[in-house]
């Protein structure tokens, strides 16, 4: 309350490992780290623990916990200062690229932890907090280009910024998941 009195535009972001719907209210937090998103993406693409149908169930259940405007403010990480890095968990570059695409197109705010964009790897804490790799020769340039491209597309797309979310396909046999985002005429 004191922070909002001092600066009504201040963003209050909380960290919680569970769903945050009880913490997100006008008199509480504006947003929270959405580890439910991270866990679903990691379980499907990095750990191969769940099917597309289970992914869909988890993502839609998560979205149902919040009013839509709140869901659009959730902070969606693939990893963080407290988790193994996605690159460390998923050594398959194609699956990693799919995870980035999911993160950049899913409702909410994509949270890119430093180094994610260049493929920084690291296991459990403290390895997830390793120094940034500044040597461009050691950076994953393809991954960086993908991040730049998807961020550019997201910035220009009303559907990706505030559009609705509908599942189009869950194929457990082929391990395919597709969804659609629309906002007016934009999709």
What are these regions (language model features)?
Residues 98, 165, 174-176:
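Short beta-strand-initiation
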Residues 17, 117, 172:
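Residues that form or immediately flank small-molecule/cofactor binding pockets and catalytic motifs
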Residues 55, 92-93, 172:
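A conditional alpha-helix N-cap/helix-loop micro-motif detector
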Residues 33, 78, 163, 170-174:
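Intrinsic-disorder/low-complexity regions
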Residues 61-163:
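Active-site-proximal substrate-binding groove within the catalytic cores of carbohydrate-active enzymes
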Residues 169-187:
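Carbohydrate-binding surface patches
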Residues 103, 167-170:
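Short Gly/Pro-enriched turn/cap motifs at secondary-structure boundaries
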């Amino acid at each position: 309350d004191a922070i909002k009195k001092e600066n009504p535009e201040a963003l209050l972001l909380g960290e919680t490992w569970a769903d945050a719907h009880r913490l997100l209210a006008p008199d509480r937090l504006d947003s929270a780290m959405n580890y439910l998103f991270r866990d679903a993406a990691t379980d499907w693409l990095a750990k191969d623990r769940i099917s597309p149908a289970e992914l869909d169930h988890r993502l839609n259940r998560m979205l149902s916990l919040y009013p839509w405007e709140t869901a659009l403010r959730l902070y969606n990480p693939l990893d963080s200062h407290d988790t193994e890095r996605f690159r460390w968990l998923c050594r398959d570059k194609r699956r990693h690229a799919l995870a980035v695409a999911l993160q950049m197109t899913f409702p909410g705010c994509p949270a890119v932890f430093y180094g994610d964009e260049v493929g920084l790897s690291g296991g459990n804490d403290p390895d997830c907090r390793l120094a940034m790799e500044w040597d461009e020769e050691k950076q994953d340039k393809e991954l960086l280009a993908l991040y730049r491209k998807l961020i550019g597309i997201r910035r220009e797309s009303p559907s990706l910024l505030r559009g609705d979310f509908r599942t189009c396909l869950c194929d457990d046999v082929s391990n395919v998941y597709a969804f659609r985002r629309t906002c007016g005429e934009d999709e």
